Amino acid sequence: DTLANNPLTVEVKGPGVATLNRYGVVVFFDVRPVEEMAFLAHLQPALSNPYPTPEIEELEVRIEPGNPESVKGDVAYIENAAVERLQVIADVLSKSALLSLYEKKVASEFDRIEPLAVELDRSGYLPGQSKELLKKIGSMLMVEQRMVGRAEITEKPDVLWDNPSLEGLYVRLEGEFEIKERHTAIERKLNLISSTVHTVLELVSSKHS
């Protein structure tokens, strides 16, 4: 049964709850592993370009009525398990999982690209063979393409518009998972990758003109 939309939040046999996020992340609450696997298997036909290895984020959620809501380490303390609260938690967890994927991908490409960027800055020439260089350009462009839509990571979830009282919980979760800081770090590396691609393409074009 559907409990809410944007993000889609549904009941899972158990009973439990799952949210299906626009980033392609599923967040489970109180769902047994066997039910998680069954739920994901049900979604499999609808998936396109799934990652070979899933990125997993975990957060313990404790319900403590009457106490201030807080986040301490890997534990979130909330007043109740209202769907809106679960959606806020799911939003941050999904962003964190997506950032983890981006961080790994960007880090591996950045390590390959940085020497090229340094050499370009130092001499203005393209090192290495042209075939290898074109492979690097293709790899860099693919990284940028996979990052499309990343700006949405810093946006607040829509659920806060109708539930402004939950903004404090969102801000605490966002800070605990360092969403803004991690996003900024990725942006810096992507900017270097982008400028390097632009410079390389200009140099390659001038060589063939």
Regions found by a protein language model. Give the residues of each.
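Membrane-associated alpha-helical segments
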Residues: 117-209
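Intrinsically disordered, low-complexity, positively charged segments
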Residues: 1-5
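Extended alpha-helical interaction modules
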Residues: 7, 11-131
